[in-house]
A protein has these predicted regions:
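Formylglycine-dependent sulfatase
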Residues: 2-5, 13, 20-497, 503-516, ...
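Acidic, histidine-bearing metal-coordination/catalytic regions of metal-dependent phosphoesterases
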Residues: 8
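Residues forming the ATP-binding cleft of Hanks-type serine/threonine protein kinase domains
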Residues: 521
């Protein structure tokens, strides 16, 4: 055995299982295969048992759940892609690592977890979506997409050639899987590996792989019971958002109907440009497969002249059909990676983690997208398998958060958790030994306003029964004055701001400052804000104290 690895292992037996310490382990440290999708909702994984997934199963992800532990209460600290990735890389909350919003850059002076894994003797790699405003740090190997990346024939850059992107022919999920396998094929066999496989899918606008286009045509997915939510009994944020399927999903871009282009309308032109950003990359064969399904479907839609609730239901059905068709490729990828591990005798000593950067709305409250502290976007799927160390087919309902992922990686590597990380390693839960001091509540904070979807800034605290949310901040153009990054010419956020102004997207948003309180036991769908109602004084006081404790402890300076 390599002497460096031996030196790292010998002290482990002396370490306790308390927060920040490594659990005693067997002689060899495990490999880590971390698979993360973008916007994969729990509702879209059949192991979680939702009505949608019963009609569109995910057998390979389910197989992973059968081999390990499925977490039902995994939450994010900021339900937005790049901030979630920054949290994964640093183990820090958004305000601590600098990546509070999409356009802000992570503080690169912070230590990245892969750097610590490297120092501990791991070979590190990342393939697929990086989407951070910096070079990958701490990776021996990277093969990453250009920004958000495209589904069809995307651009990648490779180790030592950061920023020099080259187009590759194929589908993003398939290519990402292939590059993951290339890493595994060429890794140093005398080292444990830590590989991050980050899929673009199923991010908006849901372009399926050619073989899966239209695979759910004719399948009628059940409407969520809150689909027709009118947002009564809640504050203004739920009403002023721009993520409603009926009103805000774009027929041209999201539903892929270029025939509806209106060259006199700026929104129509922008939507068409977004669609052509994918269609224009397709090969003749890919476009033929796409046209075969979408052209007749679009013709039927235009002829039907739907409106009102009929149009809303059509949008919902086709949104879910496209989304789940994209998930089919992700599920196949998980199966291919699991099969590879088994075929190469790596399955017994590899921790496999499956998750998403955050949750997603699949029609609940009539919505798509994420951002809110409400349950569907606050939750994220988490499944962990480690044969012989984690019991098979078990479920966990303890409260875990994505700030726990970094400490978990480090614990497996035998690296002491840095003091600035406030998350907890998951090993005790995975072993069935919940510590007495395990968290009883958690803190959440969303910062990215004003931008697309117009979800207002808010933070909050959630425990096993109640949730307290505080919405705050200036509205509309008054908020722009506080976001200097949005006014830098040439940046994507500047272009976004120009577009939003041109379409009067947020010119009438009011300033807000109010609380919402939900009893998740009696109101799991969060339809009734009980803040200020008689009988809630005690729980409100308790949650307000916890919220202020978090703000003080974490040094939140937003207010």
């Amino acid at each position: 055995m390599n002497q460096n690895i031996t030196k790292a292992i010998l002290p482990l037996a002396a370490l306790s299982c308390v927060h920040g310490k490594m659990l005693a382990q067997d002689a060899a440290r495990p490999n880590i295969l971390y698979i993360m999708c973008d916007d994969h909702a729990m509702q879209a994984i059949s192991a979680y048992g939702s009505p949608i997934s019963k009609l569109a199963p995910t057998p390979n992800i389910d197989r992973l759940a059968q081999r390990g532990m499925l977490f039902r209460n995994c939450f994010v600290e900021n339900s937005l892609s790049t901030p979630s990735r920054a949290c994964l890389m640093t183990g820090l909350y958004s305000h601590q690592n600098g990546q509070r919003q999409l356009a802000e850059g992570i503080d690169t002076t912070k230590t990245f977890v892969p750097e610590l894994m490297q120092k501990a003797g791991y070979e590190t790699g990342i393939v697929g979506k990086w989407h951070m405003m910096c070079r990958p740090k701490g990776f021996d190997y990277y093969y990453i997409l250009d920004g958000q990346g495209k589904y069809y024939n995307p651009n990648f850059c490779t180790t030592g050639n950061y920023g020099k992107y080259k187009q590759e022919m194929g589908y993003a999920t398939t290519l990402t899987t292939q590059h993951a396998i290339e890493f595994l094929d060429h890794r140093q066999k005398d080292k444990p590996f830590c590989l991050y496989v980050h899929h673009k899918a199923p991010h908006r606008s849901w372009f399926a792989e050619p073989k899966h286009i239209g695979m759910y045509d004719g399948v009628d997915f059940p409407l969520p019971k809150t689909f027709w939510d009118n947002y009564e009994n809640r504050g203004s944020a739920a009403k002023t958002q721009k993520m409603n399927i009926e009103k805000d999903m774009e027929l041209i871009l999201d539903f892929k109907i270029p025939e509806l282009l209106d060259t006199s309308d700026v929104e129509s032109m922008a939507s068409y440009a977004g669609l052509m950003g994918e269609l224009g990359r397709m090969t003749a064969a890919q476009r033929m497969a796409w046209d075969k399904y979408y052209m007749p479907r679009n013709r039927r839609f235009i002829e039907a002249k739907l409106s009102g609730k009929d149009l809303a239901v059509w949008k919902y059905q086709n949104y879910i059909r496209d989304y789940m068709s994209v998930i089919a490729s992700v599920d196949e990828s998980v199966g291919q990676l699991m099969d590879y591990l088994k075929a190469h005798d790596l399955d017994k000593n590899t921790v496999v983690i499956y998750t998403s950067d955050q949750g997603f709305y699949m029609g609940e409250h009539g919505w798509f997208d994420k951002r809110f502290m409400y349950e569907e976007s606050l939750h994220t799927p988490l499944i962990i398998s480690y044969p012989g160390h984690i019991k098979e087919g078990v479920e966990n309902t303890d409260m875990v958060q994505n700030i726990d992922f970094a400490p978990t990686f480090l614990a497996y590597a035998g690296v002491q958790q840095p003091k600035e990380m406030t998350g907890k390693p998951l090993q005790p839960l995975l072993a069935g030994n919940k510590p007495k001091n395990w968290r009883k509540d958690l803190y959440y904070h969303y910062y990215d306003y004003p931008t697309y979807h117009l979800v207002r800034k808010h933070d909050g605290v959630r425990n096993d029964r109640y949730k307290l949310i505080y919405f705050y901040g200036k509205g509309g153009m008054r908020a722009v004055e506080e976001n200097k990054y949005q006014k830098i010419p040439g940046t994507s956020e500047y272009n976004c701001l120009k577009y939003l102004n041109a379409t009067h997207y947020f010119n009438d948003d009011a300033d807000v400052s109010y609380y919402e309180l939900y009893d998740l036991q009696n109101d799991p769908d969060e339809l009734n804000n009980i803040y200020g109602k008689k009988g809630t004084e005690k729980v409100t006081k308790q949650l307000m104290k916890r919220l202020n404790d978090y703000r003080k402890e974490l040094k939140i300076e937003e207010y």
